[in-house]
Amino acid sequence: MKLQKLKLHGFNNLTKSLSFCIYDICYANTEAERDGYIAYIDEQYNANRLTEILSETCSIIGANVLNIARQDYEPQGASVTILVSEEPIDPRDIDTSEHPGPLPNSVVAHLDKSHICVHTYPESHPEGGLCTFRADIEVSTCGVISPLKALNYLIHQLESDIVTIDYRVRGFTRDVNGVKHFIDHEINSIQNFMSEDMKSMYDMMDVNVYQENMFHTKMLLKEFDLKHYLFNTKPEDLSAQEHKRITDLLWKEMREIYYGRNIPAIG
């Protein structure tokens, strides 16, 4: 059933938080290659580029940037936090329906007392040749706008092998009759805010706690092409045995991250 538009008493006090982790997986055979991958991914997702992505996110959703704090770290990693504010807006003009959010050159929305932040975590292990890159992103808003409108754009910008997403609505707001409302928009699944092309690229599963207004979606890239996971190595340079070993190693790593548990080796 579609929710009726609420006439609120004062400001909308609901807090809506969207957080997600994206993972990029790579195989680097030698220590030099592992160091090279970490240096490459650290440069690709340095503080300046992350600031550009988050600033574009603010532009898409129509937020005013109040302050930007950014930092690159040694030996690797970066963080960016942007505080944003809302422009005057009529809540009746806000689209709260359940559908994919905008990409660049699309609809704008507005935020208040809100922030967008990202932290990156490159890592590798000397045994096995596996390297992973994780970016944690959070978009938290107060008011009538759902940060889910930014989800579509951000995942397109940070295309990765695995994505885990959490969305939660906290607090309550009152209508003019004093009745408390703990959510002000319809949502059955985070997936409903994703574009069809994104859905076709990933296997997904939901774990939702509707009565607590908590929603969780996991995404695992469907298509696997080994050449996209090798750093400074070509698949044709591998023996059939090495090709299979590395493929199995990468798939095991991706499944473990997707399911959030270690998978015992067979045999």
Swiss-Prot record:
Q: Enumerate the GO terms in the molecular function aspect.
A: adenosylmethionine decarboxylase activity
Instruction: Tell me which EC number(s) this protein carries.
Output: 4.1.1.50
Posttranslational modification, per the record? Is synthesized initially as an inactive proenzyme. Formation of the active enzyme involves a self-maturation process in which the active site pyruvoyl group is generated from an internal serine residue via an autocatalytic post-translational modification. Two non-identical subunits are generated from the proenzyme in this reaction, and the pyruvate is formed at the N-terminus of the alpha chain, which is derived from the carboxyl end of the proenzyme.
GO-annotated cellular components: cytosol
Q: Does the keyword GTP-binding apply?
A: no
Question: What does the entry give for GO biological process?
Answer: spermidine biosynthetic process
- Name the residues annotated as catalytic in the UniProt entry: S114, H119, C142
Its pathway, per UniProt, is: Amine and polyamine biosynthesis; S-adenosylmethioninamine biosynthesis; S-adenosylmethioninamine from S-adenosyl-L-methionine: step 1/1
Q: Which reaction does it catalyse?
A: S-adenosyl-L-methionine + H(+) = S-adenosyl 3-(methylsulfanyl)propylamine + CO2
Gene3D superfamilies recorded for this chain? S-adenosylmethionine decarboxylase
UniProt keyword annotations, A-Z: Autocatalytic cleavage, Decarboxylase, Lyase, Polyamine biosynthesis, Pyruvate, S-adenosyl-L-methionine, Schiff base, Spermidine biosynthesis, Zymogen
NCBIfam families xref list: SAM_DCase_Eco
Q: What does this protein do?
A: Catalyzes the decarboxylation of S-adenosylmethionine to S-adenosylmethioninamine (dcAdoMet), the propylamine donor required for the synthesis of the polyamines spermine and spermidine from the diamine putrescine.
Q: List the protein's name.
A: S-adenosylmethionine decarboxylase proenzyme
Q: Which organism is it from?
A: Erwinia tasmaniensis (strain DSM 17950 / CFBP 7177 / CIP 109463 / NCPPB 4357 / Et1/99)
